[in-house]
């Protein structure tokens, strides 16, 4: 670990394999001072794509992993930290995706930077959020969807809580959550808080085991937005293509950003229920359609983003999305 700290402090980039080993040392034997020193040095130097991929692989290796017998598994998970308290877009979208027949292994946590994280809103709406890995695996196989709470599946992360808190700044771990799905999802939609991270995380994902992914940033949001142009990087194996999409490209209307504002977990749970049951129209429904459609597309279940949005719309309008919520609430670990 001392060698890695020295080299990174001197401005040297680590290889992906070295970054993976450094992550293992962080989780297994490094002191808090060493962890803080490495994270600070990486931040000062600037984390490279191979370093991000290597750390993500090391974090995955330390996780409690599951292997549900459903495919293609998809995850919708963002970095958070975009500074906008919107409704719970990726979480609500997950039910729409699963309702469309695409199995979902949702990875998430309690809120860090917003009023309501995925775990907060799911707990409020009556879903068991802290199930053990075998139970989540069964849940995905039986209902088509499961929620993996980060602290349950990533106990090794306890080692970095203290150093991260004391540093008080963003580190490489702020972008690793979406890259460390414990079910090794086949396809992902990854939202990022900074547009500059779109090509960075797309490149990192292309170096990992994910088959297909969309890395997205929507005019200030770590989601595909419905208030302007969104930047998208599409990962297919080792290839990456970057482009932009507008709401009209997806077949939804444009809205003001303020129209997708969220609130407390209670308020966001009410919005989630209303959207899934077809009682909420307008911007909040449209942003869910856009992001659910993206997940359906990248899972290979639609030929285009717009076709994915059509499938998402059908999931809500037929009652399938609401039924998916009911089945997850009723599942007993």
Swiss-Prot record:
Cofactor: how bound: Binds 2 magnesium ions per monomer.
E.C. designation(s): 2.4.2.18
Residues the entry annotates as binding 5-phospho-alpha-D-ribose 1-diphosphate: 78, 81-82, 86, 88-91, 106-114, 118
Keywords: Amino-acid biosynthesis, Aromatic amino acid biosynthesis, Glycosyltransferase, Magnesium, Metal-binding, Transferase, Tryptophan biosynthesis
Coiled-coil stretches: none
Assembly description: Homodimer.
Stored InterPro entries: Anthranilate_Pribosyl_Tfrase, Glycosyl_Trfase_fam3, Glycosyl_Trfase_fam3_N_dom, Glycosyl_Trfase_fam3_N_dom_sf, Nuc_phospho_transferase
Reactions this protein catalyses: N-(5-phospho-beta-D-ribosyl)anthranilate + diphosphate = 5-phospho-alpha-D-ribose 1-diphosphate + anthranilate
Any one of the GO CC terms: cytosol
Residues reported to bind Mg(2+) 2: 222-223
Residues noted as binding anthranilate 1 in the record, renumbered to the chain: 78, 109
Cofactor(s) in the UniProt record: Mg(2+)
Pathway involvement of the protein, from the record: Amino-acid biosynthesis; L-tryptophan biosynthesis; L-tryptophan from chorismate: step 2/5
Family stated for the protein in its record: Belongs to the anthranilate phosphoribosyltransferase family.
Cited Pfam families: Glycos_trans_3N, Glycos_transf_3
A GO BP entry: L-tryptophan biosynthetic process
Protein known as: Anthranilate phosphoribosyltransferase
Record lineage: Archaea, Methanobacteriati, Methanobacteriota, Stenosarchaea group, Halobacteria
Binding-site positions, anthranilate 2: 164
GO molecular function: anthranilate phosphoribosyltransferase activity; magnesium ion binding
PANTHER family membership: ANTHRANILATE PHOSPHORIBOSYLTRANSFERASE
